[in-house]
Curated annotation (Swiss-Prot):
<comment type="function">
    <text>Plays a role in lysine utilization by acting as a lysine decarboxylase.</text>
</comment>
<keyword id="KW-0663">Pyridoxal phosphate</keyword>
<dbReference type="InterPro" id="IPR008286">
    <property type="entry name" value="Prn/Lys/Arg_de-COase_C"/>
</dbReference>
<dbReference type="InterPro" id="IPR000310">
    <property type="entry name" value="Orn/Lys/Arg_deCO2ase_major_dom"/>
</dbReference>
<keyword id="KW-0210">Decarboxylase</keyword>
<dbReference type="InterPro" id="IPR015424">
    <property type="entry name" value="PyrdxlP-dep_Trfase"/>
</dbReference>
<dbReference type="Pfam" id="PF03709">
    <property type="entry name" value="OKR_DC_1_N"/>
</dbReference>
<dbReference type="InterPro" id="IPR015421">
    <property type="entry name" value="PyrdxlP-dep_Trfase_major"/>
</dbReference>
<dbReference type="GO" id="GO:0006554">
    <property type="term" value="P:lysine catabolic process"/>
</dbReference>
<comment type="similarity">
    <text>Belongs to the Orn/Lys/Arg decarboxylase class-I family.</text>
</comment>
<protein>
    <recommendedName>
        <fullName>Constitutive lysine decarboxylase</fullName>
        <ecNumber>4.1.1.18</ecNumber>
    </recommendedName>
</protein>
<dbReference type="InterPro" id="IPR036633">
    <property type="entry name" value="Prn/Lys/Arg_de-COase_C_sf"/>
</dbReference>
<dbReference type="InterPro" id="IPR015422">
    <property type="entry name" value="PyrdxlP-dep_Trfase_small"/>
</dbReference>
<dbReference type="InterPro" id="IPR011193">
    <property type="entry name" value="Orn/lys/arg_de-COase"/>
</dbReference>
<dbReference type="InterPro" id="IPR005308">
    <property type="entry name" value="OKR_de-COase_N"/>
</dbReference>
<dbReference type="Pfam" id="PF01276">
    <property type="entry name" value="OKR_DC_1"/>
</dbReference>
<dbReference type="Pfam" id="PF03711">
    <property type="entry name" value="OKR_DC_1_C"/>
</dbReference>
């Protein structure tokens, strides 16, 4: 952070000579100087180079207009205006709130001015650095001797071993020096919420529009459990999204509560839909409670917002309508919704308090923002028992939290403040929109087939597109008005083979083939469905990566149309079973898997599997207690009907539980098993395409086995 831009030269001695002296003095202070050609060049440079820490310009030539333009990009950036005795100073009180300083053109003053600019630069860096991160930086710079944990002592221990030196050189000194003990009192305590840790949480709450925020250093899986342990006491009833993350299924196993399920929709493509409006009504909840053994009126509700595939709820409507005192929005995938107007009313923290309710929102800061893995946040709006909540927080929080993770969460929040933050999110949205348009253009210009995108026919402007009733593109037959919206940064690519209504064509290209092709070229897909691939356009996606993905898709089309051999097109897949793939070509493989999917009627099978819920024989908590007592046995997956599952069973993708602990498949829900067996059959026919099924293990003979509770007697 040492770059200063100077606008000039001006072609007159009394201006250029003082600036020339100043340049030399600034270089002596450690600054790097650049000379933009004009204001357009300067603004482009600031937009794409956040390391710039100041701008020097002539007031007569640029005045407030340039200041206003720069403020739109970064209102904190120091601006240095040079004036002469005849300059007109038309500056209002509002204008003086800018980081704007004035200097006169004068020879012999360069060193003093450079020292002041160094001071203003230090103030700028201090101003944009959040409190805990600032304190951590200061502590590391002090290089204190410690006789406490961690044992590597700021990386010193690593340098006493050859392999340790490799580790130290890879991660770097500052990373290891910042890994400090909770014994460092000047950094406060994450568990007690004191000192810079408390300042960080208050800073984050203000940034995200929450009344209170908590930093969690071991993932939103833990954040979800913290909220649940506080909000759903033993013996209570919990209203929960069936599309929930497995961490919430684990919560149900830990906590002795009765789950009542909110049943979401999905379309023929396998894309996860939202929970219909009718499910949130009091009449619907009363029916569910009456049909569930031991259930009472729920004290807490959990809703996944957004869905994995990027569908956001009208959260304002849910908060007003859902008649429970506590609502938790699991927003792991959308920590950015507070920072762009298109997401207004679609996040847990949007809007004001709701009388008589407390709203929780958990976010995986690391998923779509610039934070280290496991960085997570809990936001709260409404009245709650802080002491009781903190007990739940401490119950799940290590007494040795990672301070680099804490600093990364806080820095992620700092990056979103002010105009720089708005621009950061807007750039992500615009880049995703541009990518969508490019795929559409290539599809229109392509000879024969090309990929499509799951979106409305017209996407001219950035917005959250409504999943409106009566429209064909989304494939949800009973969509509600003003209820669900597609996030533009969650891009789902469609491959040939099936349309949004589930109609299958004679030929198709299963998405798993495209995912393997891209993976072998260094492009990792977030999620793969039967004929769709999900890509996340986070703030870290730049034009180079977006163009690389486009190039990968066009290369796949070219290779597919040439009908290359598997050996040449997918060498890693070929290595899985060279004998099987020896003479096979890509079109043969694609049509083979496609025919297998058609044979089993995958679209219909998938819809039926998720539509009919298994029978709950006991709660997940009760089933877990049986399992840890050893009252379980292992059976083949084919024998699952009529047995009570000991574990949750979920295929990935989509990563949504099909069967919970304590649930049993019956004749009515037999299609769940048929769907699982169909997924297994693809891997049995084609090596390298085995399905990852959580809760089922494949033995050496290729048989999938699951754990069930022992039958009585």
């Amino acid at each position: 952070m040492n770059i200063i831009a100077i606008m000039g030269p001006h072609g007159v001695f009394y201006k250029d000579e003082p600036i020339k002296e100043l340049e030399s003095a600034l270089v002596a202070q450690g600054f790097q100087i650049i000379w933009p050609q004009n204001s357009v060049d300067l603004l482009k440079f600031i937009e794409h180079n956040p390391r710039i820490c100041g701008v020097i310009f002539d007031w007569d030539e640029y005045s407030l207009d340039l200041c206003s333009d720069i403020n739109q990009l970064n209102e904190y950036l120091p601006l240095y205006a040079f004036i002469n005795t005849h300059s007109t100073m038309d500056v209002s009180v509002q204008d003086m709130r800018m980081a704007l300083w004035f200097f006169e053109y004068a020879l012999g003053q360069a060193e003093d001015i450079a020292i002041r600019m160094r001071q203003y630069t230090d103030e700028y860096l201090d101003n944009i650095t959040p409190p805990f991160t600032k304190a951590l930086f200061t502590y590391v710079k002090e290089r204190k001797y410690t006789f406490c944990t961690p044992g590597h002592m700021g990386g010193t221990a690593y340098q006493k071993s050859p392999v340790g030196c490799l580790f130290y050189d890879f991660f770097g000194g500052n990373t290891l020096k910042a890994d400090v003990s909770i014994s460092v009192t000047e950094l406060g305590s994450l568990l007690d919420h004191t000192g810079p840790h408390l300042e960080a949480e208050e800073y984050i709450a203000r940034t995200f529009g929450a009344e209170q925020s908590y930093i969690v250093t071991n993932g939103t899986s833990t954040s979800n459990k913290i909220v649940g342990m506080y909000a759903a006491p033993s013996g209570s009833t919990l209203l929960i999204d069936r599309n929930c993350h497995k961490s919430l299924a684990h919560l149900l196993m830990m906590n002795d509560v009765v789950p009542v399920w909110l049943k979401p929709t999905r379309n023929a493509l396998g894309i996860l839909g939202g929970i219909p409006r009718r499910e949130f009504t009091r009449d619907s909840i009363e029916e569910k409670v009456a049909a569930t053994t031991q259930a009472q009126w729920p004290v807490h509700a959990v809703i996944t917002n957004s869905t994995y595939d990027g569908l956001l709820y009208n959260t304002d409507w849910i908060k007003q309508t859902l008649d429970v005192p506590s609502i938790h929005f699991d927003s792991a995938w959308v920590p950015y919704t507070h920072f762009h107007p298109i997401y207004q009313g679609k996040s847990g923290m949007s809007g004001e308090r709701v009388a008589g309710k407390v709203i929780f929102e958990t976010q995986s800061t690391h998923k779509m923002l610039a934070a280290l893995s496991q960085a997570s946040l809990i936001h709260i709006k409404g009245e709650y028992d802080e002491e009781a909540f903190n007990e739940a927080f401490m119950m799940h929080t290590t007494t040795s939290p990672s301070y680099p993770i804490v600093a990364s969460v806080e820095t992620a929040a700092a990056m979103l403040r002010g105009n720089p933050g708005k621009r950061l999110i807007n750039r992500s949205v615009e880049r995703a929109l541009h990518f969508r348009k490019e795929v559409q253009r290539l599809r229109e210009e392509s000879d024969g087939w090309f990929f499509d995108i799951w979106q409305p026919p017209q996407v001219d402007e950035a917005e959250c597109w409504p999943v409106a009733p009566g429209e064909q593109w989304h494939g949800f037959n009973d969509a509600d008005a003003d209820h669900m919206f597609l996030d533009p940064v969650k891009v789902t690519i469609l491959t040939p083979g099936m349309d949004e209504q589930g109609n299958m064509s004679e030929e198709g290209i299963p998405a798993a083939l495209v995912a393997k092709f891209l993976d072998e070229r260094g492009i990792v897909v977030e999620k793969t469905g039967p004929y769709n691939l999900l890509f996340l356009f986070s703030i870290g996606i730049d034009k180079t990566k977006a163009m690389g993905l486009l190039r990968g898709l066009t290369e796949f089309k070219r290779s597919y149309d040439l009908n290359l051999r598997i050996k040449n097109m997918l060498p890693d897949l070929y290595a899985e079973d060279p004998d099987f793939y020896r003479n096979m070509r890509i079109q043969d493989l694609a049509q083979g898997i496609h025919k297998l999917i058609r044979k089993h009627d995958l679209p219909g099978l998938m819809l039926r599997a998720f539509d009919t819920l298994p029978e709950m024989i006991m709660t997940p908590h009760q089933a877990w207690q049986r399992q840890i007592k050893g009252e379980v046995e292992t059976i083949a997956l084919e024998q699952l009907v009529g047995r009570v599952s000991a574990n949750m069973i979920l295929p990935y993708p989509p990563g949504v539980p099909l069967l919970m602990p304590g649930e049993m498949l019956t004749k009515e829900s037999r299609t769940v098993l048929d769907f699982l067996l169909m997924l297994c059959s693809v891997g049995q026919h084609y090596p390298g395409f085995e399905t990852d099924i959580h809760g089922a293990k494949q033995d050496e003979d290729g048989v999938y086995r699951v754990r069930v509770l022992k039958m009585a007697g």
